[in-house]
């Protein structure tokens, strides 16, 4: 009897501390689909998350409201066009504030390629482009060549070949407390990482780990194999909560 009561007590404490994660079905994930996204990018990440059991919903400019962010487990900013400012120009200042407040108060942000640029201070021709400013660092191009290619990265100390097109490089010197998941093997720049923003977390990935086989075919690239398992491992870690956050109002 004592052992049973102790077990129940342990389960209760774990649930109250957020140690037991919600099932995927209970987690709503918002995926931006609007001006500034590339063809097939929102759909690729949505398909992957839906197959994993998550409740995915597309969201467009005019819909980044406080109401829509309620009970949201993660916001996804997928890959986009060569001009990341298209997204910024499509959103109102209040919508950007709502997004930042959501993350600051314990939400999760996943930025892939263009979404990674938008997470930090994006540099184009030595000019700083306005962004979400969720990362305290500048974000530059990993390489100037705009063509799709197979890029080599070191993911958790294992070399991988992944789909890449005009992806961002993250300045690790400005992110001393970040959880570094991947670097580009040629330059050593950050390719994937998770960093705190207020009480929330920001996960950014330069390469397109959500790419499907048709992406390789359309670009006349020989597929090295899909990277979906890497992306899902990253997302599952991003979604984990080790404590319950106290809500704080973000000003500005």
Where are the regions a protein language model picked out?
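Boundary at the C-terminal end of the N-terminal hydrophobic targeting segment
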Residues: 19-21, 26
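Catalytic beta-strand/loop cores that center a nucleophilic Ser/Cys/Thr
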Residues: 144-215
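Class I SAM-dependent methyltransferase SAM-binding "motif I" and its flanking Rossmann-like core
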Residues: 120-161
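Bacterial N-terminal signal peptides
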Residues: 5-16
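Short hydrophobic beta-strand segments
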Residues: 26-38
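Extracellular ligand-binding/catalytic regions of CAZymes and related secreted enzymes
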Residues: 27, 100, 207-252
């Amino acid at each position: 009897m004592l052992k049973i009561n102790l077990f129940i007590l342990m389960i209760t404490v774990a649930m109250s501390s957020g140690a037991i994660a919600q099932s995927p079905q209970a987690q709503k994930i918002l995926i931006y689909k609007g001006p500034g996204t590339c063809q097939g990018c929102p759909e690729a990440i949505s398909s992957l998350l839906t197959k994993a059991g998550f409740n995915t919903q597309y969201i467009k400019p005019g819909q980044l409201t406080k109401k829509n962010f309620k009970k949201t487990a993660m916001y996804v900013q997928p890959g986009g066009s060569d001009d990341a400012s298209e997204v910024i120009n499509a959103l109102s200042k209040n919508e950007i504030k709502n997004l930042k407040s959501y993350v600051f108060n314990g939400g999760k942000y996943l930025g892939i390629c263009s979404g990674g640029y938008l997470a930090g201070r994006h540099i184009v021709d030595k000019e700083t482009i306005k962004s979400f400013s969720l990362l305290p660092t500048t974000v530059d191009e990993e390489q100037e060549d705009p063509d799709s290619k197979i890029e080599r990265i070191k993911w958790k100390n294992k070399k991988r070949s992944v789909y890449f097109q005009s992806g961002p490089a993250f300045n690790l010197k400005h992110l001393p407390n970040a959880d570094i998941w991947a670097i580009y093997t040629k330059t050593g720049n950050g390719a994937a990482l998770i960093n705190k923003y207020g009480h929330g977390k920001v996960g950014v990935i330069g390469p397109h780990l959500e790419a499907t086989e048709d992406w390789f075919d359309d670009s006349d690239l020989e597929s090295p194999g899909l990277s979906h398992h890497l992306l899902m491992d990253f997302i599952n870690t991003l979604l984990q909560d080790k404590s319950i956050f106290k809500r704080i109002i973000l000003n500005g």
